[in-house]
UniProtKB/Swiss-Prot annotation:
It comes from Bacillus subtilis (strain 168). The gene is licC. Induction: Induced by lichenan, lichenan hydrolysate and cellobiose. Subject to carbon catabolite repression. It is a multi-pass membrane protein. This is Lichenan permease IIC component. It is found in: Cell membrane. Its main location: membrane.
Length: 452
C-alpha cells in the first residue's frame, strides 16, 4: 500500500495537478456549465409535452387546441438551440477572467466572431418541391445549438487568446483620465476586437473557397466527428470513467476535469436524442451526459450510494458508523465528497480498486441494457444530477420504468463490488479502535490508583 501511495504522490499527482489547473480546460468546463440552467428549464417543458400518461395528449388537445405540443416546444427550442451561442460567450468570459483581462468585452467579441463564422443560410422546402433549398438571410438555429458547440469552443479560446495578447502588449487606444471607466474599457477592446473579427472573417472566406464551404463543416469533419465517435463508444467511455476515478483518487475533482473535455460530446449527444424524442423517432445515442449522471455514478463519482448505505447499515467500527450517518443524506442526492475525503477514498489503495471498478461495471451493464433495447435510452431530458435515483431514471427516459429498474440493478451490483472491500476497511478501523481502547484502559486504571 505504501508503494502505491508513493507512486500516486510522486508520479500521478504532479501530472494530474497540472491538468486540473489548466486554464483552458477550466474555462471550457465553466463556460459550458453556463448553459445548464437553460437546458434544465427547457427540459421541464419537454417533460410536460411528453408525459407518459394514457389519454394525456388527447386531454391537452381538447383543452388547449391541436397545436398545444408545438407551443410547448417554443421554450424548448429557445433554451436548447442556443447552447453554442451561450458557450461562445461563457467560455471566452471565463478564460478572460483567468487571464485577468476584461471578461465582458472578451465574451462579446467571441459572440460576434461565432456569428461571423456561421453561414446565414437556412433550409427551406418550397410547396411541391422534393428537395430542400438553402435560403440566405436567416441565422440557422441548429448551428446555434449543440451542432455549433465545437466551433463555439474553438472560437471562444482563439478569440480570447488574441484579445489578451494584444491587451497584455498594450496595443490599445488609451482614453484621457476624465473618461468614465466603462467607456474607456470599450475603447480598449477596439483593436483586439478588430483583429479577432478580421481573422475570423478571413478564415471564413478561405474555407468557403474549399469543398468544406463553412467553418462549421470543417470543424465537424476534422474534430467533431472523431471525438463524437470516441465519446460515443463503449471503449472511450470506459477510459473517460477510469481517468475520472484516478483523478479523484489523487484528491482532484475528476468529474470537472474530464467533463471539461467530454461534456461538449455528451451534451451534443443529449441534444440529438432530445430532437429525436420530440419528433417521436428512434433515439440515436446511448452515451450522453445523463447516461453518466443518472445510471453510472449513482450517489456520486464511483457509484458510491451502495457503499454509503452499506456503511450506514452494516458498519461495526464507530468511525464508519458515524460517517455513514453523516454521508447517507448527501449520497441520496449524488453528493459524495464526505466519504471521498472523510473515509477516505483519496490515496487509499484498499478502496481505490472498487472505486475504479464499480463505474466501469455500471457503464458496461447500462450499455448492454440500452443497446439491446431492454432499457430505454436517455431521452435528452436534462434531469438535475442531484435528483435521487429511481425518480431520475424514470424521468430521464421520458417516463420509462426500465430506466428506474436499470438504476436499481446498478445499485445492487455496486453493493456486490464494494462490500468485501468495505468489510476489510471496517475491520481494520474496528481493530484500531479496540487497540486504542486497550492502550487507554490501563492508563485510566493507573490514574485511579494514583488518586487513591
Amino acid at each position: 500500500m505504501n508503494k502505491v501511495n508513493q507512486i500516486l504522490e510522486e508520479k500521478v499527482m504532479p501530472i494530474a495537478g497540472r491538468i486540473a489547473g489548466q486554464r483552458h480546460l477550466q474555462a471550457l468546463r465553466d463556460g459550458i456549465i453556463l448553459t445548464m440552467p437553460l437546458i434544465i428549464i427547457g427540459s421541464f417543458f419537454l417533460i410536460i409535452g411528453n408525459l407518459p400518461i394514457p389519454g394525456y395528449a388527447e386531454f391537452m388537445a381538447k383543452t388547449f387546441g391541436s397545436s398545444w405540443s408545438e407551443k410547448l416546444a417554443y421554450p424548448v427550442d429557445a433554451t436548447f438551440e442556443i447552447m453554442g451561442l451561450v458557450a461562445a460567450f461563457g467560455i471566452a468570459y471565463r478564460l478572460a477572467e483567468k487571464y485577468g483581462v476584461d471578461a465582458l468585452s472578451a465574451g462579446a467579441i467571441s459572440l460576434a466572431a461565432f456569428l461571423l463564422a456561421t453561414p446565414y443560410q437556412v433550409p427551406f422546402m418550397p410547396d411541391g418541391a422534393t428537395k430542400e433549398i438553402m435560403v440566405g438571410g436567416g441565422i440557422p438555429l441548429s448551428l446555434m445549438g449543440s451542432k455549433g458547440l465545437f466551433v463555439a469552443m474553438i472560437i471562444a479560446m482563439v478569440s480570447t487568446e488574441i484579445y489578451r495578447l494584444i491587451i497584455q502588449r498594450n496595443l490599445v487606444f488609451k482614453m484621457p483620465d476624465g473618461v468614465p471607466p466603462a467607456v474607456s474599457k470599450s475603447f480598449v477592446a477596439l483593436i483586439p476586437g478588430f483583429a479577432v473579427i478580421f481573422l475570423i472573417w478571413a478564415a471564413r472566406l478561405i474555407v468557403e473557397a474549399t469543398p468544406f464551404e463553412s467553418l462549421h463543416n470543417i470543424v465537424s469533419v476534422l474534430l467533431g466527428t472523431p471525438l463524437s465517435i470516441l465519446g460515443g463508444s463503449l471503449g472511450g467511455s470506459l477510459v473517460a470513467e477510469a481517468v475520472k476515478m484516478l483523478l479523484w483518487a489523487c484528491g482532484l475533482h475528476g468529474a470537472n476535469i474530464v467533463g471539461g473535455v467530454m461534456a461538449p460530446i455528451w451534451y451534443g449527444a443529449m441534444d440529438a436524442n432530445r430532437i429525436a424524442f420530440q419528433a417521436g423517432e428512434e433515439l440515436p445515442k446511448i452515451f450522453t451526459q445523463q447516461f453518466f449522471d443518472i445510471w453510472v455514478n449513482i450517489g456520486g463519482s464511483g457509484a458510491t450510494l451502495a457503499l454509503v448505505v452499506t456503511m450506514f447499515l452494516r458498519a461495526r467500527s464507530k468511525q464508519m458508523k458515524q460517517l455513514g450517518k453523516l454521508a447517507v443524506g448527501p449520497a441520496i442526492f449524488n453528493i459524495n465528497e464526505p466519504i471521498i475525503f472523510g473515509m477516505p477514498i483519496v490515496m487509499n489503495p484498499m478502496l481505490l480498486l472498487p472505486f475504479i471498478i464499480t463505474p466501469l461495471v455500471t457503464v458496461t451493464l447500462t450499455y448492454i441494457g440500452m443497446s439491446t433495447g431492454l432499457v430505454a435510452k436517455p431521452a435528452g431530458i436534462a434531469v438535475p444530477w442531484t435528483m435521487p435515483p429511481i425518480f431520475s431514471g424514470y424521468l430521464a427516459t421520458g417516463g420509462k420504468v426500465s430506466g428506474a429498474v436499470m438504476q436499481a440493478i446498478n445499485i445492487a451490483v455496486s453493493f456486490v463490488v464494494y462490500y468485501p472491500f468495505f468489510r476489510m476497511w471496517d475491520k481494520q478501523k474496528l481493530k484500531e479502535e479496540n487497540d486504542l481502547e486497550l492502550v487507554q484502559t490501563p492508563a485510566a486504571t493507573d490514574d485511579k490508583e494514583a488518586a487513591l
